[in-house]
Swiss-Prot record:
It comes from Tachypleus tridentatus. This is Proteinase inhibitor. Residues 8-58 form the BPTI/Kunitz inhibitor domain. Keywords: Disulfide bond, Protease inhibitor, Secreted, Serine protease inhibitor. InterPro entries: Kunitz_BPTI, Kunitz_BPTI_sf, Prtase_inh_Kunz-CS, TFPI/VKTCI-like. Its main location: secreted.
Amino acid sequence: TERGFLDCTSPPVTGPCRAGFKRYNYNTRTKQCEPFKYGGCKGNGNRYKSEQDCLDACSGF
């Protein structure tokens, strides 16, 4: 879907909050899901709780 495409191609966004959750972001250059720190608010759709969730959503982009 277009939403999935946009989610999987967006850069990681920590957001303004400071919670520091470990999340995964799909990197279109490396074709891998990579960990990053998520602050807990705002951000974008390219943010997954697990590497597997990220791969399930974004493999093939």
